[in-house]
C-alpha cells in the first residue's frame, strides 16, 4: 500500500504506520509469506508481493517498534484459503512424500534465513485457513493423512529452528464448532503436537458472537490449546467506494460483503458499531479460558 503512495494519518496528522499502531497499543503483527509470488517471467502477482525479502523488511520495522511477529506460511505462491490451496510452482508434480520434505526444507530454510537477519518470528502458523486442507489435490480434505503429513512437516521444521516458538494451526469460520471438532479430531489422530488454535471470524460470514464464544471455549477445553482469533474485522460503512476505486464497471469486484448479510448483524455498519464489535471481541478473549489475543485483518 505504501509503495502505491498511500499515507497513514492519526487525527489528521501524517505518520509512520508502525508509530501509529504502537501509540494505540498494538504489540504484534501478522505477516504472510508466499513461496514465489511472481509469474514465470518474473512479474509480481501483486497484493504486497509477500516474499521472504518483503517479510524481512516489514518484520524489522515491526520489531524496531517493539512488536512481535506472527508468521503466516501459506505454502503457496499467492493467496491460500478455504476456496483455493494451490501447490507452489516449484513443487508441482511432487508426490505426497516429496511435498512433505519440501514443506520441511522450505520452512526450515526460510526460518534460518530470518534468524540470520535478526527477524525470527515469535509465533508461526503452519498454513493459512486450512479448513479444506492445503496444497491441493493431495492435501485436500478429506485426505487427512496427507493434511497431517504436510502440517506436521512444517511443525517439525519450526521446532528444529526454535523449540520455544509456539505453533498455530489456523482454520476459518470461527463460529462453526462441528467443523472444528471434526477437523481437529482427524488431525489429533495423525499429526504432530502444536500450541495454538487460530480462528478467522468475520461476523457477516462466520456466525454469531455467541457461537464464536462457544467454539472458543470448547476448543480450549477439548484440546487444551490456547485460542487466537487470527483474523477478525468489522466494517464501518456500506457507502459505495467507487470514487476511491476508480475502476470500470467490468473491473469492479463489488462489496466485501453483501447488504443482505449486513442486515443480520448484531452491530450496525457504522464507526460506533465497529468500535462496539471490537470491544466485545476483546472482552470475549479476556473472558474465555485460553483466549490469547487477536489480529485485525
Residue ranges and their predicted role:
Residues 50-54, 80-194, 207-216:
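Active-site cleft segment of glycoside hydrolase catalytic domains centered on the general acid/base Glu
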Residues 4-23, 55, 103-113, 177-189, ...:
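Short, acidic/polar
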Residues 2-13, 37-53, 131-134, 172-181, ...:
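Acidic-and-aromatic substrate-binding clefts and catalytic sites of carbohydrate-active enzymes
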Residues 189-199, 208-254, 293:
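Aromatic-lined glycan-binding groove of carbohydrate-active enzymes
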Residues 1, 27-31, 69-73, 122-126, ...:
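Hydrophobic faces of well-ordered beta-strands that scaffold small-molecule active sites
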Residues 1-57, 61-68, 76-102, 198, ...:
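N-terminal substrate-binding region of glycoside hydrolase catalytic domains
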Amino acid at each position: 500500500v505504501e509503495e502505491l503512495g498511500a499515507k497513514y494519518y492519526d487525527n489528521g496528522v501524517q505518520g509512520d504506520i508502525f508509530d501509529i499502531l504502537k501509540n494505540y497499543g498494538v504489540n504484534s503483527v501478522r505477516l504472510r509469506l508466499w513461496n514465489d509470488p511472481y509469474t514465470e517471467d518474473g512479474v509480481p502477482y501483486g497484493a504486497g508481493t509477500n516474499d521472504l525479502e518483503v517479510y524481512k523488511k516489514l518484520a524489522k520495522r515491526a520489531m524496531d517498534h517493539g512488536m512481535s511477529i506472527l508468521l503466516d506460511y501459506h505454502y503457496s505462491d499467492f493467496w491460500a484459503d478455504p476456496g483455493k490451496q494451490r501447490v507452489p510452482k516449484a513443487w508441482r508434480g511432487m508426490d505426497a512424500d516429496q511435498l512433505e520434505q519440501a514443506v520441511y526444507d522450505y520452512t526450515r530454510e526460510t526460518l534460518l534465513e530470518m534468524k540470520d537477519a535478526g527477524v525470527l518470528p515469535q509465533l508461526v502458523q503452519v498454513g493459512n485457513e486450512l479448513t479444506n486442507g492445503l496444497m491441493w489435490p493431495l492435501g485436500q480434505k478429506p485426505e487427512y493423512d496427507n493434511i497431517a503429513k504436510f502440517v506436521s512437516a512444517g511443525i517439525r521444521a519450526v521446532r528444529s529452528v526454535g523449540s520455544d516458538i509456539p505453533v498455530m494451526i489456523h482454520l476459518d469460520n470461527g463460529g462453526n464448532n462441528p467443523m472444528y471438532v471434526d477437523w481437529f479430531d482427524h488431525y489429533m489422530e495423525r499429526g504432530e503436537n502444536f500450541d495454538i488454535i487460530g480462528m478467522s471470524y468475520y461476523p457477516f460470514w462466520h456466525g454469531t458472537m455467541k457461537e464464536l464464544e462457544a467454539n472458543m471455549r470448547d476448543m480450549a477445553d477439548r484440546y487444551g490449546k490456547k485460542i487466537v482469533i487470527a483474523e477478525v474485522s468489522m466494517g464501518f460503512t456500506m457507502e459505495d467506494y467507487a470514487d476511491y476505486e476508480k475502476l470500470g464497471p467490468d473491473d469492479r469486484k463489488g462489496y466485501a460483503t453483501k447488504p443482505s448479510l449486513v442486515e443480520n448483524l448484531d452491530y450496525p455498519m457504522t464507526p460506533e458499531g465497529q468500535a462496539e464489535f471490537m470491544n466485545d471481541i476483546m472482552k470475549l478473549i479476556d473472558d474465555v479460558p485460553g483466549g490469547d489475543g487477536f489480529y485485525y485483518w
